[in-house]
């Protein structure tokens, strides 16, 4: 005899008619057999098969044997849960219909069933405010996904939501053929990196720069954010905006931009104490740079000092220097943007300047300026349009040449400046006494008397009254080994080497956030 039981917990159909003692007739409805399987009988007491039946707000499916299905696919489009009810407006992680009979390890995928119970396929769909993508079989997509030329990131296998904003991601695996070539390139991409996805989920790529939250960032053609030194970042093609180190020794300083460390990445502005560029072969030095819109302030190739050749610098490169105003103060930079300190010859002004250990240009008197393992006193102009320039000639009773105070070693020394001759003591004090006898160390002549016009020598006598030729052996002023500063000086040693300038980077009050200089 068939056992009749009401499906109460899930089903809400009308109650079955009370079972008559003779059981000669039955009303349509649900019944559970001795095995606990539900069936549905129509008004003719026929078992319903291959058909959906609705009970209250829920739909249930009877298979070809009339058994109500549970936790199963129906026609590869619908899914019924453990209670047998059709899934609607909900997610389900399960095997595909075709894999049900031959399950594979980790073969489950997420499916979404809409308001009519059908799985979502081959489309994007907004669900609870988030956008998801599905393949032709209805499986939710995850990870990297390419749709035409657009690239998205859809979270991990249990997420799937279309991402927006910044994400630190691994580049796609080789099997990700849909996006391989768009989001991955072993030549110019790191194994991991920052990517930015717009509000529409599309990855930023194929652009030299992009403004995000008020700051500029650079991306290569594969969408990976570029950081630190960028070679070719100024061009419009993202494919040319490469990470540093791809063109070692062949890059021009004009090619280079700086965009902060990988944790930040935005285009640099202000002062930075950083390692140099590998492409420019300055990566072995840590120097101060000043950036404006990512470009370093630097000397141009017109700022050539005229000092060249293997005797000038260790690598034989030409020396370039420029005095550049930064935030109201003057600093010195070379052609690669490295800030310079100490005594520097600036070709554009054809003069020497001094920049202290923090890079600031100094004016006035500077004592103990190192030169050839010795120290000298310099004086730099403070006004009259020559701010900072080393002075020439007499100043307060002392003789200067390009800022350097000219001195005797022990006694008195004659210097020739232009076509004029001067006599100074070991402190650099100009002499003008016509009665005093001087020991001249230029040629070790003793007891010489001079006549002067102002401080300029106009005549001289030796102790025996004979004329002394003060023009025969005067000292020529020099800084290091430099006696003049025209472009003809290609064989003398550079004063840059001889005065033992050591570039040192000191704390400027620079902060990680602003790169400011105090």
Give residue spans per PLM region.
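Extracellular adhesion/carbohydrate-binding repeat motifs centered on closely spaced tryptophans
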Residues: 2-495, 499-502, 506-508, 512-518
């Amino acid at each position: 005899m068939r056992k009749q039981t009401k499906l109460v917990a899930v089903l809400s159909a009308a109650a079955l008619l009370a079972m008559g003692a003779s059981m000669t007739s039955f009303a349509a409805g649900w019944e559970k057999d001795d095995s606990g399987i539900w069936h549905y009988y129509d008004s003719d007491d026929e078992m319903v098969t291959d058909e959906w039946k609705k009970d209250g707000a829920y739909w249930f499916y009877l298979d070809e044997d009339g058994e109500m299905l549970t936790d199963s696919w129906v026609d590869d489009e619908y899914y019924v849960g453990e209670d047998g009810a059709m899934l609607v407006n909900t997610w389900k992680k399960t095997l595909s219909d075709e894999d049900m009979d031959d399950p594979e390890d980790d073969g489950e995928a997420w499916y979404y069933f809409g308001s009519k119970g059908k799985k979502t396929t081959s489309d994007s769909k907004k669900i609870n405010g988030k956008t998801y993508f599905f393949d032709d079989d209805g499986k939710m997509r995850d990870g990297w996904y390419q749709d035409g030329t657009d690239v998205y990131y859809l979270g991990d296998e249990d997420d799937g939501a279309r991402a927006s904003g910044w994400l630190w991601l691994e580049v796609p695996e080789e099997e990700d053929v849909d996006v391989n070539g768009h989001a991955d390139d072993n030549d110019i991409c790191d194994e991991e990196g920052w990517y930015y996805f717009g509000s529409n989920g599309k990855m930023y790529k194929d652009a030299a720069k992009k403004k995000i939250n008020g700051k500029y960032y650079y991306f290569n053609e594969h969408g990976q954010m570029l950081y630190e030194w960028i070679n070719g970042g100024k061009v419009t093609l993202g494919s040319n905006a490469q990470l540093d180190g791809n063109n070692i020794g062949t890059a021009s300083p004009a090619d280079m931009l700086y965009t902060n460390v990988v944790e930040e990445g935005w285009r640099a502005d202000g002062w930075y104490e950083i390692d140099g560029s590998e492409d420019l072969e300055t990566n072995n030095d840590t120097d101060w740079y000043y950036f404006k819109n990512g470009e370093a302030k630097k000397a141009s190739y017109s700022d050539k000092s005229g000092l060249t050749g293997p005797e000038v610098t260790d690598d034989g490169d030409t020396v370039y220097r420029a005095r550049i105003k930064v935030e109201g103060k003057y600093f010195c930079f070379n052609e690669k943007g490295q800030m310079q300190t100490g005594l520097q010859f600036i070709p554009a002004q054809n003069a020497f300047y001094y920049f202290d250990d923090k890079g600031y240009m100094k004016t006035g008197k500077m004592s103990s300026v190192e030169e050839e393992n010795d120290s000298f006193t310099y004086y730099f102009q403070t006004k009259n349009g020559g701010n900072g320039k080393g002075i020439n000639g007499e100043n307060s009773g002392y003789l200067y040449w390009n800022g350097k105070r000219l001195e005797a070693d022990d006694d008195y020394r004659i210097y020739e400046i232009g076509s004029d001759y001067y006599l100074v003591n070991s402190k650099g004090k100009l002499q003008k006494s016509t009665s005093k006898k001087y020991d001249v160390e230029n040629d070790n002549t003793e007891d010489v008397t001079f006549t002067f016009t102002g401080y300029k020598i106009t005549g001289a006598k030796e102790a025996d009254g004979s004329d002394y030729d003060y023009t025969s052996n005067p000292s020529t002023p020099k800084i290091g080994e430099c006696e003049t500063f025209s472009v003809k000086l290609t064989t003398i040693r550079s004063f840059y080497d001889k005065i033992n300038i050591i570039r040192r980077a000191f704390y400027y009050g620079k902060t990680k956030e602003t790169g400011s200089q105090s």
